[in-house]
């Protein structure tokens, strides 16, 4: 399974691509950071993010997209930008017809480190170790995106299939 993980952000949006199967080490395919200029108008920043993520989805052709779920932050301006970037990220996968799953930061931390309370340094160290990299992915947004992708490979594939089966059952359809 190839998964594109997205750590949404309006100024820096991390994107990580891995391949793997549950219970096995994943393989790094690529990672990127999409940057927007804070001095640009919001519509231009969102448009740049949309075009960049759409191009990365087309380039890497993932089987699934994993996006970090926006959580409440004290800075309303920051959370608004992150929420807008998250919407663009979800749309990039949905527009391509690819299943999109969202994860809370604690779900990702628990999947990758075994602790939902892990800090950034622990997360980056585990991503580096799990992907057998010679050096940590930089910046942290890229490491976070790779952690999301790893989490989805290990947990999300099953979660997505269960959700699809439940949806089919609700609509009265079989397999």
UniProtKB/Swiss-Prot annotation:
Keyword Ribosomal protein: no
Residues at the catalytic site: 7, 68, 141
UniProt-annotated binding residues for Mg(2+) 2: 68
Catalytic activity as recorded in UniProt: Endonucleolytic cleavage at a junction such as a reciprocal single-stranded crossover between two homologous DNA duplexes (Holliday junction)
GO BP, one annotated term: DNA recombination
Organism: Salinispora arenicola (strain CNS-205)
InterPro entries: RNaseH-like_sf (IPR012337), RNaseH_sf (IPR036397), X-over_junc_endoDNase_Mg_BS (IPR020563), X-over_junc_endoDNase_RuvC (IPR002176)
Annotated protein name in UniProt: Crossover junction endodeoxyribonuclease RuvC
Residues the record lists as binding Mg(2+) 1: 7, 141
Subcellular location: Cytoplasm
Family statement drawn from the similarity comment of this UniProt entry: Belongs to the RuvC family.
EC category name: hydrolase
Keyword Hydrolase appears in the UniProt entry: yes
Known EC number: 3.1.21.10
Recorded GO MF terms: crossover junction DNA endonuclease activity; DNA binding; magnesium ion binding
PANTHER family, per database record: CROSSOVER JUNCTION ENDODEOXYRIBONUCLEASE RUVC
Named cofactor requirement(s): Mg(2+)
């Amino acid at each position: 399974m190839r998964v594109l993980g997205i750590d949404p952000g309006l100024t820096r949006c991390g994107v990580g691509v891995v391949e793997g199967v549950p219970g096995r080490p994943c393989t790094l395919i690529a990672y990127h950071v999409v940057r927007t200029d804070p001095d640009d108008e919001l519509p231009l920043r969102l448009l740049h993010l949309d075009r960049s993520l759409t191009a990365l989805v087309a380039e890497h052709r993932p089987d699934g997209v994993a996006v970090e779920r926006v959580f409440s932050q004290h800075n309303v301006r920051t959370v608004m930008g992150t929420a807008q970037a998250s919407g663009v990220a979800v749309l990039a996968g949905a527009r391509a017809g690819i299943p999109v799953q969202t994860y809370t930061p604690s779900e990702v931390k628990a999947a990758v480190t075994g602790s939902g309370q892990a800090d950034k340094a622990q997360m980056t160290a585990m991503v580096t170790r799990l992907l057998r990299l010679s050096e940590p992915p930089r910046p942290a947004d890229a490491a976070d995106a790779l952690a999301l992708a790893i989490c989805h490979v290990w947990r999300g594939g099953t979660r997505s299939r269960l959700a699809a089966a439940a949806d089919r059952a609700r609509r009265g359809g079989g397999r």
